[in-house]
Amino acid sequence: MSGRNQTSTGHEASEAGWLDLHFESSRPEYEAALLDAGIRPGWRVLDAGCGSGGFLPLIASAVGSSGFIAALDLAPENIDRVEALAGTLPEPPEVATHVGSILSLPFADASFDCVWSGNVMQYLTPAEFELAVGEARRVLKPGGILAVKDFDSTILQILPMDRALLARFMAARLQGFRDRGVLGTDCGSTLPARLRQAGLEVVSRKGWLVERWAPAPRFTRDYVRDLLAYFASVAPGYALPDADQAYWRELKQRPDRLLDDPDFCYREFFVMAVCRI
């Protein structure tokens, strides 16, 4: 796994192994969100920005063997993973994979009952977000739904890490997103407003808290260990106090000191907004 968990497209925090750990750590909440999207048997669903395919089995279960799934991602290596995963699904629907961009979908108008997009919008600029929403609206059938999920990392907590220290790190990190012009990992709570501004009717919006106390499950420990290593790798590029930089260097060497603490707690928050066309 690369130091910044990049795909071949250069997107950070989106390498397949990283995505898999994060998905398994948050599985109950992710499953609840997908069920809440309202996907029905027999539907044609586009997984727009499918990553390594974590949501594919859940979508397949929702649409059943009479349904159809198109899985699209920019990274060819992610599509390779999805193709292998599709072959293991029990009583699978038809699954078609595509290397491509959500900004220019390779599908005909009114092709899908649902477009699902999880943890993708954070990588887009506001203009690209509007373009992606326009493309989703184009390929949806009348009455179809667009379900968009993303994080609000302003609520990220990793206890017993000093909250002020993490707040300084996250402020620098979020400013980096602003400087690059992308929505960033705090965009989740802004999704309903952005979708309305793009001319869509938001029919539901809901947030989920992912909370894991010590002793944390294995997937959570592995994910947070990787997350801490990632944060430590980017911290030198931020204007943080010397004491903060020293903390991140030490934590990179000894992450289990935090993970093994009896008061360890990891919290993250995400929001899903559902629109009807």
Regions flagged by a language model, labelled:
Residues 46-48, 52-104:
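Class I SAM-dependent methyltransferase SAM/SAH-binding core
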Residues 103-115:
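A short acidic, Gly/Pro-enriched loop at the edge of an enzyme's catalytic core
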Residues 113-128:
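A short SAM/SAH-binding and catalytic strip from SAM-dependent methyltransferases
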Residues 147-216:
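Conserved catalytic/acceptor-binding region of the Class I
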Residues 189-190, 203-277:
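Conserved Class I S-adenosyl-L-methionine
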